[in-house]
Swiss-Prot record:
The gene is accA. It catalyses: N(6)-carboxybiotinyl-L-lysyl-[protein] + acetyl-CoA = N(6)-biotinyl-L-lysyl-[protein] + malonyl-CoA. Belongs to the AccA family. HAMAP family: AcetylCoA_CT_alpha. One of its GO terms (cellular component) is acetyl-CoA carboxylase complex. This is Acetyl-coenzyme A carboxylase carboxyl transferase subunit alpha.
């Protein structure tokens, strides 16, 4: 497992404990020392993970072993039938979507997938959507509306693909169209930010009735590196930018950008993915039961007001 900078001391404790346990298999002389070290390790973990900086949490969010959209879909749904294509240009492999059943409830699930190794990351375009990806997502959402199925959108992208070809095919227009259409799609929409939620790539699939966010995910108009490059002309100022952007879950909840924080295991989702899947599934099933009871007209009005009120402030 990749060790993050703030976890090095924790890893040293773990290595020492493992070494002593091997030594104590034939001689229990180390048992008391092992017990003391394990207690110190627990205290150290609580201390380190309770005082994470915004940048450290971004490193957790970007950890190579963090569960991706395909993992969540596989573990959350009792059944899943993938659907492909935008019916216009081509398939975008950065989007995985289809018909699913979660907690016994039929729905449409759409996730942004970055890939887990070099080959799959290239295949998935590192989770950066092209215009056809946004069109594919919208096609699935309109199908969900037609059959009155709730929609679950899993966000995990460093941003929409900024290539020339994507711009020529109408990248900005595709995102803008999704913003407009998602605001008036007449079926419940639950947004869940499972990793990186960056820029228009996330926003183009991020309009919904409820927005949940994993504890160490982030949601921002730009990456810290991009912000630092623009404001300070120095990408190495990413730590300062991460703090200034207010992109972590607690800040976004206080600013009323998101509605709920979904707990992760101590140290991040990659330390115990199954606990993370359980927590996300519990959140989704609870919200599905709540939203399905709200009349459609009220649901649309509340969705519109939710986003209109973001960023409002009163002058003293």
């Amino acid at each position: 497992m990749d060790i993050l900078p703030h976890e090095k001391q924790i890893h040293e404790y773990i290595k020492t404990i493992e070494h002593l346990k091997k030594q104590s298999q034939d001689n229990p002389i180390f048992d008391v020392e092992i017990q003391k070290l394990e207690q110190k390790l627990d205290s150290l973990k609580q201390h380190v993970y309770s005082e994470l900086t915004p940048w450290q949490r971004i490193m957790i969010c970007r950890h190579p072993s963090r569960p991706h959209a395909v993992d969540f879909i596989r573990h959350l749904s009792e059944s899943f039938v993938e659907l492909a294509g935008d019916r216009s240009y081509r398939e975008d492999h950065a989007i995985v979507g289809g018909l699913a059943k979660i907690g016994g409830i039929k729905c449409v699930v759409i996730g942004q997938e970055k890939g887990f190794d070099t080959e799959s990351r290239v295949y998935r375009n590192f989770g950066m959507l092209n215009p056809e990806g946004f069109r594919k997502a919208l096609r699935l959402m309109q199908m969900a509306e037609k059959f009155q199925l709730p929609i679950i959108s899993l966000l995990d992208t460093p941003g929409a693909y900024p290539g020339l070809e994507a711009e020529e095919r109408g990248q900005g227009w595709a995102i803008a169209r999704n913003l407009r259409e998602m605001m008036r799609i007449n079926t419940p929409i639950i947004i869940t930010i499972i990793g990186e939620g960056c820029s228009g790539g996330a926003l183009g699939m991020g309009i919904g009735d409820v927005i949940g966010m994993l504890e160490h995910a982030y949601y921002s108009v730009i990456s810290p590196e991009g912000c630092a490059s623009i404001l300070w002309k120095d990408a190495s100022k990413n730590v300062e930018a991460a703090s200034a952007l207010k992109l972590n879950a607690e800040d976004l909840l206080n600013l009323k950008i998101i509605d709920s924080i979904i707990k992760e295991p101590l140290g991040g989702a990659h330390h115990d993915p199954h606990i993370t899947y359980q927590n996300v599934k519990q959140f989704l099933v609870e919200q599905l039961h709540i939203l399905r009871r709200i009349p459609s007209q009220i649901l649309l009005e509340q969705r519109y007001l939710k986003f209109r009120q973001m960023g409002e402030f009163l002058e003293g």
